[in-house]
């Protein structure tokens, strides 16, 4: 083998840093760049756009009817929605390929009044799922600022929102 490659592969040292730089540049968004966005069908067949909620915090929660932890947090999301409607919106994204009527009936049984949209079980660019439930927090400017895998409750969401608003206020 030494006759074919008498010296170590010459690009080995430069490939690593170049690849790292390429990956870092790919993840950097220019100043003023918008975060993730989606337009998905709601339970009433009307499109729901994340961009329509700009100016408020948005709690984006991915869930499924078969997910026990998801069902445990639904009343908490509803409580948060009722308490913080002017300050923050909640959008539930059902991550299953079920008929809208099934999800509509399910949401009605749970007394959910926040918007529920249907992903058809397809991933949504900008929202990386590693399991269910997963909750994302989107800033009033439309930037993804937090991700939580596992259940959340109204107190957790309120505390996180207070913390982010306090931090944002101190930066001004």
Regions found by a protein language model. Name each.
Residues 1-11:
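N-terminal secretory signal peptides that target proteins for export/translocation
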Residues 25-50:
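N-terminal "domain-start" segment that seeds a small globular fold
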Residues 104-141:
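Short, internal strand/loop/helix patches
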Residues 88-100, 112-121:
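Thiol-based oxidoreductase modules, predominantly thioredoxin-like and allied folds used
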Residues 14-27:
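Bacterial N-terminal signal peptides
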Residues 56-58, 62-66, 131:
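Short pre-active-site segment immediately N-terminal to redox-active cysteine/selenocysteine motifs
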Residues 62-79:
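Conserved redox-active cysteine motifs that mediate thiol-disulfide chemistry
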Residues 137-172:
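Thiol-/selenol-based redox modules, centered on thioredoxin-like
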């Amino acid at each position: 083998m030494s006759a074919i490659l008498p010296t170590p592969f010459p690009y080995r040292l430069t490939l690593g840093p170049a690849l790292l730089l390429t990956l870092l540049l790919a993840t950097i968004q220019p100043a003023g760049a918008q975060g993730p966005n989606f337009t998905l069908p709601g339970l009433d067949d009307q499109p729901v756009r994340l961009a329509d909620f700009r100016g408020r915090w948005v709690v984006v929660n991915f869930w499924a009817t078969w997910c026990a932890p998801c069902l445990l947090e639904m009343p908490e999301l509803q409580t948060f929605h009722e308490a913080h409607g002017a300050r923050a919106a909640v959008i539930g994204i059902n991550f299953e390929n079920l008929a809208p009527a099934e999800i509509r009936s399910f949401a009605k049984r749970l007394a959910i009044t926040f918007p529920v949209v249907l992903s058809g079980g397809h991933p949504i660019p900008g929202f990386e799922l590693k399991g269910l439930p997963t909750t994302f927090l989107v800033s009033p400017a439309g930037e993804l600022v937090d991700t939580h895998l596992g259940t959340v409750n109204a107190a957790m969401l309120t505390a996180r929102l207070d913390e982010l608003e306090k931090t944002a206020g101190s930066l001004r």
